[in-house]
Design a protein with these regions (language model features):
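Extended, compositionally biased accessory segments flanking or bridging domains
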Residues: 1-61
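Low-complexity, polar/amphipathic intrinsically disordered segments that mediate membrane, lipid-surface
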Residues: 2-3, 46, 50-51, 66-70, ...
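C-terminal-of-GTPase-core extension/linker across diverse P-loop GTPases
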Residues: 6, 125-133, 137-177
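Structural motif
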Residues: 30-35, 78-83, 103-107
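Canonical P-loop GTPase G-domain recognition
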Residues: 40, 56-62, 97-149
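A short, well-structured beta->alpha microelement
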Residues: 45-74, 81-90
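Membrane-inserting effector segments that mediate pore formation, membrane fusion
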Residues: 162-255, 259
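Acidic, carboxylate-rich catalytic segments that either coordinate divalent cations
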Residues: 261, 265-309
Length: 309
């Protein structure tokens, strides 16, 4: 099954769009209360180091004066273990318009926040991993800059990747269940999987580079394998073929996404592969040049024979 050129073009346009999304400006304001523990301060300091020039983290002390964060702020973090100033400060920040999350070691230290809302929440923990994983999900739930946030802050990448993979798997599950024309689902699924690849590459800071071509080829080949397996299973269970197609499409896409995450976490070096491809291309070019040069005299000789005749 061939992928139409227009769909490949759309896939690479999608890559350019993802690159633009990853470069979207991200602004985080951090307010440090005098009661904040060293654990909270060090955890946030280490986690919020922008990995691109589009990310900015502003840090201020939480004083008695009225707080007025800048209007371009995407999310506000308040680090506190409880104080008399905390509640009024949080109210001022919420009114300013950006989502506010209070980071504490215990929810008891923030009694005025009874439950999370789209504009206000609490993440309380003494375990660094749990704190950051929960905070990552909290931020991703409240921003439309998921790719940019994950590209800038490494602790958010797994949470963002899980969302991308799950979304693509569910999309392809629906495609597998609803597309009944044989072979018609492959281009649609392949396009979604290539889009997933570009998004994952962007959030792990790999960028849209020529090396992605190897991965795109792997995704397309993997899609063909999934398609072959699906056909074999459908023949065995024709009465529930639509369900089999949906499940294998979802499982295959999910597995493909997990494999890509593993690949990007390791940062594979493609220099050797590039050397092989370059050398092969050079040999093919030389061979074509040699063959073309050898056929020119023969063509001239044939033309002369025709004239003599």
């Amino acid at each position: 099954m061939k992928i139409p050129v227009d769909k490949l073009t759309r896939a690479f346009k999608m890559g350019a769009s993802v690159k633009k999304d990853s470069d979207t400006p991200v602004r985080v304001s951090v307010y440090l209360d005098s009661s904040a523990s060293r654990f909270l301060a060090e955890t946030v300091r280490d986690a919020f180091v922008p990995q691109t020039t589009s990310g900015i983290v502003r840090v201020e002390r939480l004083g008695e004066e009225r707080i007025a964060p800048k209007t371009d702020t995407d999310v506000v973090l308040v680090l506190s273990c409880g104080s008399d100033r905390l509640e009024s400060a949080v109210q001022e920040l919420v009114i300013a318009g950006a989502p506010v999350c209070v980071l504490a070691e215990s929810a008891v230290e923030v009694p005025f926040v009874e439950e999370s809302t789209p504009m206000l929440g609490v993440v309380a923990a003494t375990d660094k991993t749990y704190l950051l994983e929960t905070l990552a999900r909290w931020i991703l739930d409240r921003t439309d800059k998921e790719t940019a946030f994950a590209a800038n802050f490494a602790f958010m990448r797994i949470a963002a990747a899980n969302r991308i993979i799950t979304s693509c798997a569910l999309t392809n599950m629906a495609t597998g269940a609803l597309v009944f024309l044989p072979g018609a689902d492959y281009p649609v699924m392949a396009l979604a999987q290539v889009g997933m690849l570009f998004e994952l590459a962007a959030i792990f800071g790999r960028g849209i580079k020529p090396e992605r071509g190897y991965e795109v080829a792997g995704v397309l080949a993997g899609g063909l394998v999934i398609r072959a397996v699906t056909r074999a299973l459908v023949k065995q269970t024709p009465h529930i073929g639509f369900a089999v197609k949906a499940l294998t499409a979802a499982a295959g896409t999910y597995g493909m996404g997990r494999a890509l995450v593993s690949l990007y976490e390791r940062d594979v070096d493609y220099s050797r592969a590039n050397e092989v491809v370059t050398a092969t291309f050079s040999r093919v070019r030389d061979l074509v040049t040699t063959v073309a040069g050898a056929t020119r005299p023969m063509a001239s000789y044939q033309d002369a024979s025709d004239l003599a005749a």
